A protein has these predicted regions:
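Conserved N-terminal beta1-alpha1 strand-loop-helix module at the mouth
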Residues: 1-77, 81-88, 98
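Short beta-strand/loop segments at the ligand-binding rim of alpha/beta enzyme cores
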Residues: 23, 70-82, 119-129, 165-175
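Catalytic beta/alpha-barrel core
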Residues: 29-35, 50-57, 78-85, 101-111, ...
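Short, surface-exposed connector motifs at secondary-structure boundaries
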Residues: 44-51, 74-75, 97-102, 120-123, ...
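N-terminal active-site wall of soluble small-molecule enzyme domains
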Residues: 59-98, 109-121, 133-139, 156-160
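Catalytic cores of alpha/beta
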Residues: 87-96, 134-144, 178-196
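Glycine-rich phosphate-binding active-site loops on the catalytic face of alpha/beta enzymes
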Residues: 99-111, 146-159, 189-211
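C-terminal helical cap(s) of enzyme catalytic domains, especially alpha/beta-barrels
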Residues: 117-121, 162-163, 184-188, 199-222
Length: 222
């Protein structure tokens, strides 16, 4: 008989340096790490504090329901941007809130009036993904965005530092980069939480199969 603890364990541990981030509070929980994925197999085997579920299609309620049910932790769900905006975005966001998401995420191209409507109608945080500390980001924050998610590639730490200097209390999520050093720089710049992209499922499966083939070969030699 299998011990439950041995079955449900984290095969994908987020980088330890992320634990040094101060964290953001969502649904009464302190969140320092978010796994950037919609893959349920990855999510269920990762020890991140929350899930950042954003994908390049219109948000589907069936996908949201599956993510919320399986994740067993707060889910920040993408609801709009350049593809989905206006009334459709608002309807999707309201439905996502009723399904139990901890927050909704829109990207930098979202119209200001949509941000205002989301802030007015939702009880969960409205997170805007930004690429720069510019006039667009400022208008979105003024319109009611309650958090920002900084995704600026190699300039992420720089953008985080600029935002932090202007908005001292604004919760900031940011991509951390591929190395512990890059993550540490982003946290030092003022990020409260880090979104972490796990290895591709194909890479993980390849490693498992290489181990399986090695063990099979050893059995033949025994």
């Amino acid at each position: 008989m299998h011990d439950t603890a041995s079955i449900f364990h984290a095969d994908l541990a987020v980088p330890a340096v992320i634990r040094t981030a101060p964290g953001i509070f969502v649904q009464g929980r302190r969140i320092r790490s978010l796994v950037f994925s919609t893959d349920l197999a990855v999510i269920c085997h990762c020890d991140a504090d929350a899930v950042l579920a954003v994908y390049p299609f219109t948000c589907q309620p069936a996908i949201t329901q599956a993510l919320v049910a399986a994740s067993q932790r707060p889910v920040l769900n993408g609801v709009g941007g350049s593809i989905t905006h206006g009334e459709r975005c608002i309807e999707v966001a309201l439905h996502s809130e009723m399904q139990g998401v901890a927050g909704v995420v829109v990207n930098t191209s979202i119209p200001i009036d949509t941000v205002e409507a989301l802030a007015a109608k939702l009880n969960v945080p409205v997170v805007v993904t930004v690429c720069a500390d510019d006039a667009v980001a400022a208008r979105q924050i003024e319109a009611g965005a309650t958090m920002v998610n900084v995704a600026a590639g190699g300039r992420t730490a720089e953008v985080v530092a600029s935002l932090r200097s202007r908005y001292h209390e604004l919760p900031v999520i940011a991509t951390g980069g591929r190395t512990d050093e890059a993550i540490a720089r982003t946290i030092e710049a003022g990020a409260d939480a880090i979104s972490w992209t796990p290895p591709d499922i194909r890479v993980l499966e390849r490693a498992v199969m290489e181990k399986a083939r090695r063990l099979a070969a050893e059995q033949l030699e025994a």
